[in-house]
């Protein structure tokens, strides 16, 4: 399954379109009555959604409401039920995919937003991987934690120059923290969960400060 946060060389709308496969995977898993796989696929959608939700909300509050406040919580809750009604949740995910595709089509033909919103989306898309690390560690899923951090490192190369231009201090702190996380998480057979979690939190704080500032600039310029 291709992640829609992994790499993006075109427009943000192009990056957003790659979110659809996670919903398609959820549908396929439900059709095959594979609930565990459906949960994993929808979790992947949810993680990626964090990267694009500000962009979507700015584009259309109605679309945001449907996806974020109606479909997403309803499907998430349904997937957690011990006696899952597969046909019911399948209908919801299929309807969500239709709404998602309609939104992408609308955004593609709309007047471009302030370019700063593209920057916000790029920053958040990359950050989505880092957000996955701590929950994976706490769940004891070391493989996922490592994979998510490696994906964050991969995406970082696409935006590190932008971050550096925004804040040299934040850039240096993120770079330093990433080296420390790599040593503690990737190079250790038995990582210290508390230590790695602390390091991830430190990088996240620095990264979030840049995201927050760029979001403020985007809203002021809109």
Where are each of the predicted segments found?
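Mature extracytoplasmic or organellar-lumen-exposed domains after removal of signal/transit peptides
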Residues: 1-222
């Amino acid at each position: 399954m291709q992640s829609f946060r992994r790499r993006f060389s075109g427009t943000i709308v192009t990056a957003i379109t790659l979110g659809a496969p996670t919903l398609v995977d959820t549908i396929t898993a439900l059709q095959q009555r594979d609930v565990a796989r459906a949960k994993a696929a929808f979790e992947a959608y949810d993680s990626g959604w964090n990267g694009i939700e500000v962009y979507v909300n700015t584009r259309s509050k109605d679309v945001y409401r449907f996806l974020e406040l109606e479909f997403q919580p309803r499907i998430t809750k349904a997937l957690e039920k011990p006696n899952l009604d597969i046909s019911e949740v399948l209908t919801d995910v299929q309807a969500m995919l239709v709404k998602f595709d309609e939104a992408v089509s609308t955004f593609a033909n709309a007047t471009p937003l302030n370019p700063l919103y593209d920057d916000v989306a790029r920053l958040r898309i990359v950050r989505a991987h880092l957000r996955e690390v701590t929950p994976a560690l706490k769940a004891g899923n070391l493989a996922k934690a490592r994979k998510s951090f490696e994906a964050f490192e991969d995406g970082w190369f696409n935006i590190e120059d932008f971050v550096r231009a925004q804040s040299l201090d934040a850039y240096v702190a993120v770079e330093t923290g990433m080296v420390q996380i790599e040593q503690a998480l990737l190079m250790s057979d038995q990582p210290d969960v508390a230590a790695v979690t602390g390091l991830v939190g430190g990088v996240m704080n620095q990264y979030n400060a840049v995201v927050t500032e760029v979001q403020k600039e985007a809203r002021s310029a809109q």
